[in-house]
Each structure stands twice: as C-alpha cells, then as structure tokens.
C-alpha cells in the first residue's frame, strides 16, 4: 500500500474480525458500515491532529490545512465526525453507538493529554500508555468489540475482542513511535522525528531519558538551541532499548 493511500488498518481489522465471527464467513451490511465508520472517525481525527501539530504533509501529500486553510480543515474534520455519527445512529444498535462515541471522546482526551505533556521529561511511562490508548488503541479496541456486538456474541467473547484490539493498538503505536526514529520521510508519510521536534515524548525517548540524563536538559529547554535536536537524536541512537 502506498504512503499516500494510507494503511486502512482499522477498517481492515473490523472486516477480518467480522468475517471470522460471522456464519459461513459472510459479511453483513452493518459490519461493512461499521468498518467505514471506523475509517471516517480515524480520518477526521488525523485532519484535526494535523491542524494542532501544524503538520505540512500526511502520507506523502499535503495536509488539508496546507492545501486549503485551517478553517476548511477544521470544518472538514467536523463533517467527517458528523457523517460517522449519522451512519452510526443508523446501525440502530445503542451499544455500538456507546462504544464508538466513547472513541471520539478518547481521541479528544488523548490529544489534550499529549499537548499538556509536551517537553515534560518527568512524564511517566504509564502516562504515555494512557495517551496512546486514547489516541490509537481505543478506536481499534472498541470497533473490534462493536463487530462482536453486531454479531450477537456473549460478554466473555466481547471482552476478548476488546482486549485483542487494545493490545494491537498499543503495539501499533509503540512500533510507529520507534519508526519515527528509524524510518525515513517516505516510509512514514510524514517528516521523520517530527514527534520529538514537537515535544511529544514517546517510548524511545522515555527509555533514553533513563539512560542519558543530558537528554532531559535538552528537552526541558524545549530543544531551543541550534544543535539540541541533533544532540537528542544522537542520544536516541545510543539507547540500548532502541537498538
């Protein structure tokens, strides 16, 4: 899949789960719609995130606010959230509505938490995991569970689907954060090391802080001096966990 087309990971997981738990592996129209809703919510959150992060590219192409303007980007994200909510209501399943509504709340909460903890070298790993759950894992966990709800699974199986989605989501986020240091712009679909430059301290940085106290000095002054970002990257390269 090319960088500009996106991964389609989230709807793909929903469709695979839905097919696996459906009689004769046949997808229903509601399961297909759930996958579409999942991608709408994800895309809407990316449009808004790019505005907040002032990102110029996403998946190798201009972001919405770069191509048009901030006002259009905010309204486009709002429209996608609204359309997702409309299709969600038309599934006529209040439990699915609750699950996906929780996701939208988590996405906003995660973005707030991320920005409140910018350049905070004292940030705990548990805060990072909680933020990662809100921004990434919640959507995969709750949409996986929603697929089970539409199939009429019992509570035990629904919990298993939720846990599966949660673990996949957290693992995906950690790998994505590692790639921010080991990948290139083309692979990532966005500028490399953009998270660190923006003050978002991810798993590799938190581990590096345990080994290199000088890194906390650079981060606490918000990488303000000329060579601070390069020095921070050198610290990352010598982190045993990243290697």
Predicted segment positions?
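All-alpha prenyltransferase/terpene-synthase fold signal
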Residues: 1-240
């Amino acid at each position: 899949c090319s960088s500009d087309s996106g991964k389609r990971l989230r709807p793909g997981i929903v469709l695979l789960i839905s097919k696996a738990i459906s009689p004769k592996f046949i997808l229903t129209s509601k399961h297909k719609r759930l996958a579409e809703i999942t991608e709408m919510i994800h895309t809407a959150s990316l449009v808004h995130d790019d505005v907040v992060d002032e990102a110029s590219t996403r998946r190798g192409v201009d972001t919405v606010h770069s191509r048009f303007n901030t006002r259009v980007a905010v309204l486009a994200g709002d429209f996608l959230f609204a359309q997702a909510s409309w299709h969600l209501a038309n599934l006529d399943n209040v439990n699915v509505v609750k699950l996906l509504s929780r996701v939208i709340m988590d996405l906003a909460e995660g973005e707030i938490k991320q920005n409140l903890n910018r350049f905070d070298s004292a940030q705990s790993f548990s805060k990072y995991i909680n933020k990662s759950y809100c921004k990434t894992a919640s959507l995969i966990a709750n949409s996986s569970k929603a697929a089970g709800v539409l199939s009429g699974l019992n509570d035990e199986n629904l919990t298993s689907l939720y846990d599966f989605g949660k673990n996949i989501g957290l693992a995906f986020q950690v790998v994505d954060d590692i790639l921010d240091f080991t990948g290139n712009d083309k692979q990532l679909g966005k500028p490399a090391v953009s998270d660190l430059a923006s003050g978002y301290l991810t798993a590799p940085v938190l581990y590096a802080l345990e080994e290199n106290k000088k890194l906390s000095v650079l981060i606490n002054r918000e990488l303000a001096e000329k060579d601070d970002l390069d020095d921070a990257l050198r610290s990352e390269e010598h982190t045993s966990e990243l290697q």
